[in-house]
Structure formats: structure tokens, C-alpha cells
Amino acid sequence: MAIILGIDPGSRVTGYGVIRQVGRQLSYLGSGCIRTKVDDLPSRLKLIYAGVTEIITQFQPDYFAIEQVFMAKNADSALKLGQARGVAIVAAVNQELPVFEYAARQVKQTVVGIGSAEKSQVQHMVRTLLKLPANPQADAADALAIAITHCHVSQNAMQMSESRLNLARGRLR
């Protein structure tokens, strides 16, 4: 069993999603958004750090998964996003959580099957995969999708390791 915290970083809205993985079964534990309504960036970063720390304390995740920075057309926006990611990662590292990063295209490909999927498609698939009664908020759905991606990637890595071990022992032909 593992609890995974997914984070969709943003300087104004940071989505989070928490799921439990038992074997191949995924279950929803919680999700939402950390909203920073103050104007100055240092105060927003402080709120993101405090919010992520509180979520970690509440859910006690085993793994922390976050979306990688994409190349934005606006350099200022990309820098602010990078800083928001940074404080979220520091919150995880301060709690000694292993951090995993996933590209947005990889997350969409894993959850929807199309790397260029729309937000509404991600929301629908997250709802379906986690058997939720309604679509989660867009940023929370993205965070849940990041957590789901971590489960799939780590499960595939474990299966590959087991196959290599069996091959080394001469069990696969």
C-alpha cells in the first residue's frame, strides 16, 4: 500500500490530489486547491509552502509527485511557476518524502491516452478511474492525474525489475 500526493503547481492556484494504491487498485483520499489571494509573490510562496506542508501532515503520503515546468511563452510566468514548484518540493523534502516529476504530456498520455488531451478530458478520466461522483476542479484533477501517473510509472518499473530478475535467474524463456 502507498499513499501518493500529486501537485499541480501554480503561483495563484496550486492543485493537490491524494490517492491510495493497493496493488493495481487506486482509491481517492482527497483533493482541492491552495488559493493565494495576496498580490506579492513572497507571500504567495509562503502560503503554498504552508498549504503543502499541512496536506502532507494530514495525509502522511509515501510519495510526492509534481508536474515539471513547461516552457511558457511568458518568461515571468515561467519563473513564478518555477518558484511555486520549488517551495512545494522543499515542503516535501523537509518531510523526507521522495519527489518524482512528470511532464504534462506524460500525465495526459497516461491518464487519457492522448498527450495533447484537454483539461475536460483529464477531469473525466480522473473521475472515471477514481470512481468519483463528479468531476473534480480542474487544478485538483490535474494533481490527481499526476498521482495516478506516478502509480502507473512506478508499477511498470517494478514489473520491469521483476522481469529482469526472473530473466537473470533463468525463469523467462
Swiss-Prot record:
Its main location: cytoplasm. Binds 2 Mg(2+) ion per subunit. Mn(2+) reduces cleavage sequence specificity. Cations are not required for DNA-binding. Mg(2+) 1 binds at D8, D139. The active site is at D8, E67, D139. It is an enzyme of class 3 (hydrolase). Changing G115D: Inhibits endonuclease activity, loss of some RuvA-RuvC-DNA complexes. Keywords: Cytoplasm, DNA damage, DNA recombination, DNA repair, DNA-binding, Endonuclease, Hydrolase, Magnesium, Metal-binding, Nuclease. The dual incision reaction has defined structure and sequence requirements which must be satisfied for efficient nuclease activity. These requirements are biologically important since they serve as a control mechanism that prohibits the nuclease from cutting DNA at structures that could bear a physical resemblance to a Holliday structure. Belongs to the RuvC family. This is Crossover junction endodeoxyribonuclease RuvC.
